[in-house]
Amino acid sequence: MLDAYLVEIFDLLHAAYGPRHWWPAETPFEVCVGAILTQNTNWGNVEKAINNLKKEGLLSPEALRDVPADRLAETIRPAGYFNVKSVRLKDFVGYLWERHGGSLERMFAGEWRQLREELLRVRGIGPETADSILLYAGDKPTFVVDAYTRRLFAALGVVDPETGYEEVRSLFMTNLPPDVRLFNEYHALIVEHGKHHCRKRPRCDGCGLHLFCRTHAAERPAP
């Protein structure tokens, strides 16, 4: 059964890497900002941009609402696509103020599936960003899918590499209990495994999932 298989993969990843304690942030709002900044870049660049925001006193809904877009763009330059991302941050904060009075607590107080639909209507927020905000900032039981997820579970033969976001997400949402801590840890472990082994050019040596992996089986020499 797929539910038991997904739990087995989780257990193997957890045994290999231990608890990940993700998302690294001091506040839920910092998580939201990081979820937008991490689009099309690596986490190291996001950390530099967030540190800049902290130094400039800009890591709050009020500050991001009031800061000029050009100053914001320069502040988040390390995250890449800084002009685009400054607009996306402004759009998110504009939504937060217009719809929820600038309060994340109020935003997260409602039904989370409806909130997901609202977030997806904000320019620049796609499914991965919306689910990251909901799971990591709002403690809502939604599963985050990213390139690492697709690559790993395609290698395991569970999905096709071209399977769409919602279909992959549904696989986890349907076959795992709606547990925030489980979803949080599972996604973080997938990312960690993707960095170490299940890369675009796989590093199969030492991979704890090699017995399940089609990629490893294809590359293994014939007996």
Identify the function of each model-found stretch.
Residues 2-222:
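Catalytic cores of DNA base-excision repair glycosylases
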